[in-house]
């Protein structure tokens, strides 16, 4: 874990998490290449199942292509206007060829996207994860091969808004200890008994290293 001791603090990391916002209004200024490269580098270093790194990142800066993608960045009748307005889109695709590992694909891509969001915030850039899209249509626009799947995209640019901090549930509402229902350590809810399904594969015996 060497290489960053003394350069960041736990409090600083937590402050970054708390300060990040989903930005949906952007200035027209282009994103400098050196900042874009750092965002992509953050995604490259995300963990993945067996360190397979199944991702490809498509950087879309061309205005016409961005507009074409934006036409299919919609969920039912909701169209995400900020997709057309952001100066940069990063479309995250995943390799689906391996039948076993494809079950982890969305988790892996989500981790890469999350690291990009945080790096963007650290650089003073605004970003927003967009998951409600027509993946097939966007894949066709961007010539994504059939062996790959569009999982989601990020909008990226300099923010033209400062959203208020979003509400968050307190830990007391979302944390359980040992089993669901124990709100305090040492609660009286006992572990359950498995009554459905078959035991999972013991992956350790298969010498599969899950997270790289």
Write out the residue ranges for each language-model feature:
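Acidic, surface-exposed loops and disordered segments
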Residues: 1-212
């Amino acid at each position: 874990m060497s290489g960053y001791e003394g350069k960041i603090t736990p409090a600083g990391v937590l402050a970054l998490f708390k300060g990040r916002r989903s930005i949906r209004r952007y200035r027209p200024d282009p994103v400098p290449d050196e900042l874009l490269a750092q965002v992509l580098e953050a995604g490259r270093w995300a963990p993945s199942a067996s360190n397979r790194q199944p991702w490809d990142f498509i950087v879309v800066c061309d205005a016409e292509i961005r507009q074409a993608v934006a036409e299919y960045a919609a969920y039912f009748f909701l169209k995400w206007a900020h997709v057309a307005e952001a100066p940069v889109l990063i479309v995250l695709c995943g390799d689906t060829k391996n039948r076993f590992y494809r079950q982890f694909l969305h988790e892996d891509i989500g981790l890469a996207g999350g690291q990009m969001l945080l790096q963007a915030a650290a650089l003073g850039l605004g970003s927003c994860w967009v998951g409600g899209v027509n993946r097939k249509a966007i894949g066709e626009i961007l010539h994504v091969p059939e062996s790959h799947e569009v999982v989601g995209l990020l909008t990226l640019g300099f923010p033209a808004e400062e959203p208020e901090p979003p509400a968050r549930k307190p830990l007391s509402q979302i944390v359980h200890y040992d089993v669901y229902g124990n709100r305090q350590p040492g609660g009286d809810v006992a572990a359950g008994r498995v009554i459905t399904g078959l035991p999972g594969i013991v992956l350790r015996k298969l010498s599969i290293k899950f997270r790289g």
